[in-house]
From Swiss-Prot:
Cofactors, names only: Mg(2+); Mn(2+)
InterPro entries named among the record's database cross-references: Ac/propionate_kinase (IPR004372), Aliphatic_acid_kin_short-chain (IPR000890), Aliphatic_acid_kinase_CS (IPR023865), ATPase_NBD (IPR043129)
GO cellular component terms given for this protein: cytoplasm
Reaction(s) catalysed by this chain's protein: acetate + ATP = acetyl phosphate + ADP
Cofactor detail note: Mg(2+). Can also accept Mn(2+).
Gene3D superfamilies registered for this protein in UniProt: 3.30.420.40
GO molecular function, one term: acetate kinase activity
Pathway(s) per entry: Metabolic intermediate biosynthesis; acetyl-CoA biosynthesis; acetyl-CoA from acetate: step 1/2
Active site: D143
Site entry (Transition state stabilizer), positions: H175, R236
Pfam families to which the protein is assigned, alphabetical: Acetate_kinase
Protein name, per record: Acetate kinase
Protein species of origin: Sulfurovum sp. (strain NBC37-1)
Broad EC category: transferase
């Protein structure tokens, strides 16, 4: 099956082209709407880049398909079986991948207040393709869908009940496509059906989230109504006392919009040590920088708290899974997270295995560990392809 995976951002368009679940080519278009837009095509181990003027997402879609045809990657759009779209927020409506039609488009539009930075761009990509190539099947894959299996007591906030009914205030969770992918890969590695496994998955990148998976289903996750809740992240605060916000409004004369921007873009690792690149933070810590040390210790401590909470919730944990840019590449972070968990949780990391874990799935626990510890590179695009194929296959 030939599937194009599309991720439309506010000023960018990223796509990957798959044939039978094998990635063939990728195209990235950045700085859409600016005088000089940047386009990168990666195909057959070669990279072609150039600058041009891409005025809007309509132009970007035209550029994308022109590149694919000019490079003889496809001969015509009609040979595609479907386009799979990454949609950040599915709200309470979507718990699975969905074939896109007019009704689905309007439901995604209604969710813009829940994801004002992402859903409008995601929607624009859908609408441009629907207009230019109306016969091309499109499937929406939602970042929030995997977490729709959370029980009510985990998904609700202890706020007035009316806020849920009137404003849909509840926990939705994010990174669902990544957590779903690595959970399935963990089941393959463990040679057990996913429905029998209890897992804690840690997606650690610039954005970070933890998920408790019981018998293959998400029962809790660290991100909430927005991706701001939960773990300390690259530039997002994660969990804080909500009373800090009105306190800052009163005492520092900062408006809510400024605080919102601060919590999302100037907090987390960046807020504590001025840097959100974990490699540089570790290097500076080794050079004796105390703010970098503090930032890393805070980062690890908060991950440990979630592992402890989720271990109690799950009862027993078959595997702890690290993924995402930091989870896959920062051996020191993995070591610090697992340190001290031997007695209570039976989590014992083997340093040699951990230090040598590179670009492929690896088991990094010792023989004595009661819990498997896995490093699994995530592949959200492949997961979107697989979910898209399921929907399209049902139409045949």
């Amino acid at each position: 099956m030939k599937v194009l995976v599309l991720n439309a951002g506010s000023s960018s368009l990223k796509c990957q082209y798959f044939i039978d679940e094998e990635s063939i080519a990728s195209v990235t278009i950045e700085r859409i709407g600016e005088k000089e837009s940047y386009t990168l095509l990666t195909y057959a181990n070669e990279k072609r880049e150039h600058t041009s003027t891409v005025k809007n997402h309509h132009d970007a879609i035209d550029t994308l398909f022109s590149l694919l045809k000019e490079s003889h990657i496809i001969t015509d759009v009609t040979e595609l079986n479907a386009v799979g779209h990454r949609i950040v927020h599915g709200g309470p409506h979507f718990s699975r991948p969905t074939l896109i039609n007019t009704e689905v488009i309007e439901q995604i539009r209604s969710l813009i207040p829940l994801a004002p930075l992402h859903n409008p761009s995601n929607l624009e990509g859908i609408e441009v393709i629907a207009k230019v190539y109306p016969a091309l099947k499109q499937v929406a894959v939602f970042d929030t869908a995997f977490h729709q299996t959370m029980p009510e007591y985990a998904a609700r906030y202890p706020l007035p009940y009316d806020l849920y009914e009137e404003a849909h205030v509840r926990r939705y969770g994010f990174h669902g496509t990544s957590h779903a992918y690595v959970a399935k890969e963990a089941a393959k590695i463990l040679q057990q059906p996913l429905e029998t496994l209890n897992l804690i998955t840690l997606h650690l990148g610039n954005g970070a989230s933890a998920t408790a998976i019981k018998k293959g289903r998400s029962i809790d996750t660290s991100m909430g109504m927005t991706p701001l809740e939960g773990l300390m992240m690259g530039s997002r605060s994660g969990d804080i006392d909500p009373a800090i916000i009105p306190y800052l409004v009163r005492t520092q004369k900062i408006d809510v919009e400024t605080i919102d921007s601060m919590l999302n873009k100037e907090s987390g690792l960046k807020g504590v040590c001025g840097n959100n690149d974990m490699r540089e933070i570790i290097d500076k810590m080794d050079e004796g920088d105390e703010k970098s040390r503090l930032a890393l210790e805070m980062y690890v401590y908060r991950i440990k708290k979630y592992i402890g909470a989720y271990s109690a919730t799950l009862g027993h944990v078959d595997a702890l899974v690290f993924t995402g840019g930091i989870g896959e590449h920062a051996a020191l972070v993995r070591e610090m997270v697992c340190e001290g968990m031997e007695y209570t949780f039976g989590i014992i990391l083997e340093k040699k295995k951990n230090d040598s874990a590179k670009q492929e799935a690896s088991a990094i626990h010792s023989r004595e560990s009661r819990t498997d510890i896995l490093v699994i590179p995530t592949d959200e695009e492949l997961e979107i392809v697989r979910q898209t194929e399921v929907i399209v296959s049902r139409l045949s």
